[in-house]
């Protein structure tokens, strides 16, 4: 079976975007990375792609290798008309819950773009209620829209890089390996080394890893 080229992979996503652009003009894709981990931030990105400078290979970031995501990350930043990356830390996640924290990050990212879009497409089934720009949810948007796919790559790579840096400070937690997600290894390391400030208290309480009242 012939392997599809990057251009062939991205073609349907760019066709989707072209139809949206024909109706609305400038629009942004928004996506997040890191809703599920036990520690670290949730990262949200908004991106307005330049239709004259396509980035071939864009797809749902989870379907791409780390090497491919890294290469696309740099190309997206070089070619995009505008992009914004927002980090929402564990303290906000614990205070507001992960959904509200993510929605807040999406609002900040979309409204923080250097170009004000006429529409925001958000991956998933809901949009931030307080967003001052018209928005539409797109289920599986990161595999449907090139702009959302680009945002998913920006968010994923940004978060992974953050966790790699955190790993250098706390090598005993092996954050570079699991990126903070709730793996068996991660739970074993928490039991062995305890809790650090970058952990999400609300997540750990649900799993019985955080003393009540703290």
Question: What do the PLM-derived regions correspond to, one by one?
Answer:
Residues 1-214:
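RNase H-like, Mg2+-dependent phosphodiesterase core
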């Amino acid at each position: 079976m012939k392997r599809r080229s990057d251009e062939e992979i991205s073609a349907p996503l760019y066709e989707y975007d072209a139809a949206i652009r024909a109706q609305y003009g400038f629009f942004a894709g928004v996506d997040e990375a890191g809703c599920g981990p036990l520690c670290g931030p949730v990262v949200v990105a908004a991106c307005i792609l330049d239709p004259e400078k396509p980035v071939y290979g864009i797809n749902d970031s989870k379907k791409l290798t780390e090497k491919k995501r890294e290469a696309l990350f740099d190309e997206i930043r070089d070619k995009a008309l505008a992009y914004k990356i927002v980090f929402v830390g564990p303290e906000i996640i614990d205070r507001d819950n992960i959904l509200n924290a993510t929605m807040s990050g999406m609002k900040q990212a979309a409204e923080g773009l250097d170009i004000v879009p006429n529409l925001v497409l958000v991956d998933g089934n809901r949009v931030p209620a307080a967003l001052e720009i018209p928005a539409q949810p797109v289920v599986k948007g990161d595999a449907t829209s090139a702009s959302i796919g680009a945002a998913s790559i920006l968010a994923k790579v940004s978060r992974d890089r953050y966790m790699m840096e955190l790993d250098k400070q706390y090598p005993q937690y092996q954050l570079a390996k699991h990126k903070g997600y709730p793996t068996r290894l991660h739970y074993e390391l928490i039991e062995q080394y305890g809790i650090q400030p970058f952990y999400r208290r609300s997540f750990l309480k649900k799993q019985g890893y955080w003393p009540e009242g703290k």
